[in-house]
């Protein structure tokens, strides 16, 4: 039997949260390219050409699968150079400054989870968002990258948002599985904002609500099962958060 649910958060408007049964938003995680800045999708074609791979092949998966550390570093540097060239022409997304100013006024924590390396991220923040704090910033140096939820869960844990994890038992001696820890990050009170299927899938798998920043290229993700809410400009989030976030209805098995 399917139950209909929707992701909700209490209003950020001062005084309004007391009248809401919805959980309070604890923070927002942002993608970078196509989210904080306008898409530079031409980079991906240049990267694949430099690496000699088809469009269907994930760029980072290909690099990490190369047989030696030297080959991996050579390939990684080739795509870093493409990103360095592109960052000079970064353009802020419409509504970027307004949204960040609002989140800072409402004391909403902000983090970044991106498949970029650190230089383009630092360039964007220095050029368009000087003085606005993003912490932590997860770049491609953190593995595994999106669509794996690990980066978002790491951010949640760094903010003190954790939940207990039951130890998995195995073997005749009922020995705890190797690597099992007592707690893990809990992203259920976070929002992931992005423009790609990797963003939506990572957010959903982490347990966060997801917001798609829609454009002409990613319109096919508007109705995707991993997308909770859709905006066309970043500052469209302001009235949504102020009055109370409410995602679309989702059917789940019970």
Predicted feature descriptions by range:
Residues 1-26, 101, 122-254:
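Asp-based, Mg2+/Mn2+-dependent phosphohydrolase catalytic module
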Residues 2-62, 68-71:
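Active-site neighborhood of HAD-like aspartate-dependent phosphohydrolases
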Residues 31-32, 113, 193, 213:
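Short hydrophobic segments within beta-strands
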Residues 35, 42, 118, 198, ...:
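Conserved Rossmann-like nucleotide-cofactor binding loop
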Residues 36, 110-113, 192, 230:
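Conserved SAM-binding loop
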Residues 44-48, 80-83, 121-124:
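Hydrophobic alpha-helical core bundles mediating ligand binding, dimerization, or RNAP-core interactions
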Residues 72-83, 132-136:
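Short, basic/glycine-rich phosphate-binding loops at helix/coil junctions
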Residues 85-112, 118-122, 149:
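Short, acidic loop-to-helix structural element flanking the phosphoryl-transfer center
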């Amino acid at each position: 039997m399917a139950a209909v649910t929707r992701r909700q958060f209490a209003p950020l408007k001062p005084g309004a949260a007391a009248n809401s049964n919805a959980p309070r938003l604890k923070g927002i995680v942002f993608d970078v390219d196509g989210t904080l800045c306008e898409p530079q999708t031409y980079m991906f074609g240049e990267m694949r050409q430099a690496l000699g791979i088809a469009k269907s092949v994930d760029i980072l998966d290909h690099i990490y699968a190369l047989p030696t550390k030297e080959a991996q570093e050579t390939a990684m540097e080739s795509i870093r150079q493409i990103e360095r060239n592109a960052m000079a022409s970064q353009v802020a997304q419409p509504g970027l400054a307004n949204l960040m100013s609002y989140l800072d006024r409402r004391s909403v924590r902000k983090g970044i989870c991106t498949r970029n390396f650190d230089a383009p991220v630092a360039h964007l923040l220095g050029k368009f968002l000087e003085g606005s704090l993003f912490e932590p910033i997860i770049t491609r140096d953190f593995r595994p990258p999106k669509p794996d939820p690990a980066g978002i869960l790491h951010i949640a844990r760094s903010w003190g948002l954790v939940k207990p994890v039951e130890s998995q038992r195995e073997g005749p001696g009922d020995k705890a599985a190797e690597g099992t820890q007592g707690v893990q990050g809990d992203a259920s009170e976070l929002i992931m904002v992005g423009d790609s299927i990797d963003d939506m899938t990572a957010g959903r798998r982490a347990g966060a609500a997801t917001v798609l920043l829609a454009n002409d290229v990613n319109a096919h993700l508007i109705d995707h099962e991993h997308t909770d809410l859709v905006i066309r400009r970043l500052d469209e989030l302001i009235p949504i958060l102020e009055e109370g976030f409410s995602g679309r209805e989702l059917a789940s098995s019970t």
